[in-house]
Amino acid sequence: MKKTIAIALSLAFMFNVNTLPGNTCAFGSNPYWTYTLHPDFPMDKYAAGQLGILKNTYARSYLMAAYRYLNNKPLTTDEQKGFEQLWDQRLQATSSDCAGNTESWIKLRATVPGVSKIETIDTERPVSKENSYESYCNAQTSAFETAAKTLKSMIEKYGIGSAQVKEWVAAQDEVFSNCGSPRYSDKVPEAKIPKPLPESADATCKQERAYQIAAANFYAQNFDTARRDFEAIAADANSKWKEMAGYLATRSMIRQATLAKETNKNLLEQAGQKIQHLIANPSYATLKEDLQSLANFIAVRISPDAHLNKLATEKFDQQTIEEITKTLDNYLDPDNSATEVTYSKVPENLKKNEMIDWILTFQATDEASTKHALARWKETKSTAWLVAAITGVDAEDQHANQLIAAARADKSPYAKWTLFYHIIRLESGQSKDASVKASLDKVLSAPPAELPAGALNSLKLMRLPLSANLDEFLKYGIQKPLAICSDGGVPEMPDEEDDLKGKGKTPPTFTTLAGNVLTNKFPLSVLRQVATNKQVPANLRNNVAWTSWVRAVLVGDEAEAKNLAAIASPLNKAKSKFFTSYLAATTPEDRKFAAALLMLHFSSAEPNAASGQLMDDDYGDSSGWWWGASPVRKITTSNSDDDSDSSSDDEPFDPLFLTSAQRAQATTQLAKLAKVETAPNYFAKIVLAYAQKHPADPRVPEALHYAIKCTRYGATDDATTKLSKQMFVTLHSKYKGNVWTKQTPYWY
């Protein structure tokens, strides 16, 4: 009960309870080589001090733990558990607690004979008539658990088919009917309040009904009435609900105060005074933690500065950690817009506490935060402020070399990899390539056991631009992702449970940055070398051979196209017969048609080597759908921060090992590729021209079918529909009764 009430409270006053922390994006599986919002899984190692490379994009609870270690005050075992419990709770939540247990309640309710059938219960209600577009969770899991527990006790006392049980269920239906209402409407729902039972009714039934009436008014936003009713129940010494009613009377005041257009601080202060009286009352001992949570909730809104300073001096248990981060979030981002921290706008009172000041300085990205971090480091010479300062400066900063020297001299085992990373970052910006390469190679040649996998991937990525040859590029450009994350609920949450244990089996892939270099810097001759390099896993060689062959065809390099076809064919049996036909073609016209037919069969055909997971090789929701009006593309991912480690915004770099001739080849090939039409139009023109010259070729109807299909699924423009219709007319006029004609009822 204590846990569920506390969790319910933390969510009940968030107007849009479906908003999750962080920046969610459209569903889609992406590889993560490092995380940007949290440390590596499992997080017990981070809680124990293996901080890896700290990022200022981490949630504040992770930075709270880091602050302690950076000040050489390791977390106790109990404190570590408190952090781990909070992180697990937050990351496992794929949605709010709202309506989390309605199904169990509905199922139990259905066992009562003669009750009407219900399918769902709406538990979210608009804030007000004027603010119908924002909603809050009106009834949480604990409400349905309490109802289920009460129903079971009623059945045990009166019998499942008794009038008392049926009347109680009917009244409870009215209670829960007030929880939701029509969305995006200014219509105020009509409250359904159970009627009081007659004086002659059973005493237990009357107590239950009194509680139901108060709860119904609470859910219906009749807060004055609900408070009065709950206070009356609290005064009834014989009611089993007296303590819970006293608690809910204060919640009625809080909800009334916070759902108002402007928060009613006077009413909150009154509620706070009542809560303190209840906390001091021994009868409320079982609800003490929940009452304290209410007191904290009020303190955040009445005197957040004092509340934060008090919390920051307490022992770090789960509740304290959560309360600090929640208070900071509400203070700095009251409308839940998730904007970046701007230190110059942080209230001065927040800066008085050293830990909070450090966290906000480290997270902020403005000039004021960097100046403050430098000033505090010069004053304290502490590791924590050194980390904040070196994170904020760039290579041209006048303090860069001083910070690099201090970072080299720092002996903190907890800051080691963060400081190492920023030394490399700053020296890379100063073009000290030899020093950077030597430092990285020393670590990467024998990675220490305490170096987290995500941090190791970041260091490999920094080494990538310094590759002296193709083998080095492949060594550092192919990495094992920490996980594949769909980002459909909690951001950066692995899809597979094994990844949460650090035992994921996701195969190595090209990183985003490496994929961009392959696509935008390598000529076909070097891409062919990648496709035949045994250092590269077979699935990645298949990827490169396939996409590079597509590119060779599109730019008209028949020699490379033939070479790549011979390489790609044995790597993918599904394409082998098409490649055989392509290689057997005796004229350029025939080869072009055979190539088009092959690409039409596999919508993953595009002229860009992919990073991350491979595209599907057939039609499907995750296929590449060929190419669009701009065939050359730069890859971006939801985890783009990974590749900003060594190159801003995933921008591809010029590999050191490419010759001037190879660079020129790549430039020429990319220029030709940029002129290629969008795929549906490209295929349509080839197929129509071939059909006109070779109408008897048995492959023509099949090609027309797939080319028309491409005009439905591919990237189209104003010319596509005319071409689609032209192919449709050709197919239906010249190949009547053909199996492919029958499968093509429309043009697009």
Model-inferred region functions:
Residues 21-231, 237, 241-248, 253-748:
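Extracytoplasmic/secretory-pathway proteins
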Residues 2-20:
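Gram-negative bacterial Sec-dependent N-terminal signal peptides
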